[in-house]
Curated annotation (Swiss-Prot):
Entry GO terms, CC: cytoplasm
Name of the protein described by the UniProt record: Urease accessory protein UreG
Signal peptide start and end residues: none
Similarity section: Belongs to the SIMIBI class G3E GTPase family. UreG subfamily.
Superkingdom of origin organism: Bacteria
GO molecular function: GTP binding; GTPase activity; nickel cation binding
Alphabetical UniProt keywords: Chaperone, Cytoplasm, GTP-binding, Nickel insertion, Nucleotide-binding
Localization in the cell: Cytoplasm
Organism for this UniProt entry: Citrobacter koseri (strain ATCC BAA-895 / CDC 4225-83 / SGSC4696)
Amino acid sequence: MNDYKHPLRVGVGGPVGSGKTALLEALCKAMRDTYQLAVVTNDIYTKEDQRILTEAGALAPERIVGVETGGCPHTAIREDASMNLAAVEALSETFGNLDLIFVESGGDNLSATFSPELADLTIYVIDVAEGEKIPRKGGPGITKSDFLVINKTDLAPYVGASLEVMARDTMRMRGDRPWAFTNLKTGDGLATIIAFLEDKGMLRV
């Protein structure tokens, strides 16, 4: 029997460039003084996201592990999550007292989902620059994720996107499932995501 604490595992997915790594950096910096954190990043042929988070000082370098999937990023978080599960296990054993491990997927499409063996909660990140139509396109990331982040609200005027339309479509597609607009440059919306993690992840118990 493993004698280490079993941390909450939160999968963070979304298309390339939507702001997954920026979200993780912001969450880690905001939560690291309260909780014991670690991160697993996924890239196909590099460990670029691991490098970005390390150089940004999101967490101590030994708390950030990069996984090179070498193929379809969706497979590594769903059909064959063995590399990610091994990384989560190794971090849990190394530190023993982790409260939360974030698992960032490689660039996804709207149909990507995390294996329930890998993630207890899922956050899916899209961004305003993809166009106001993105929420109504649906897909598991938008309709089934535990929390949806619509990032880069500051770009709405430049790409002709209506935040009002995006909000309406998001509520129609998600029903009662929570979501938030964010601008990670200013921190707008970050507190809502943290409150969700603390509540649904029972971190404050």
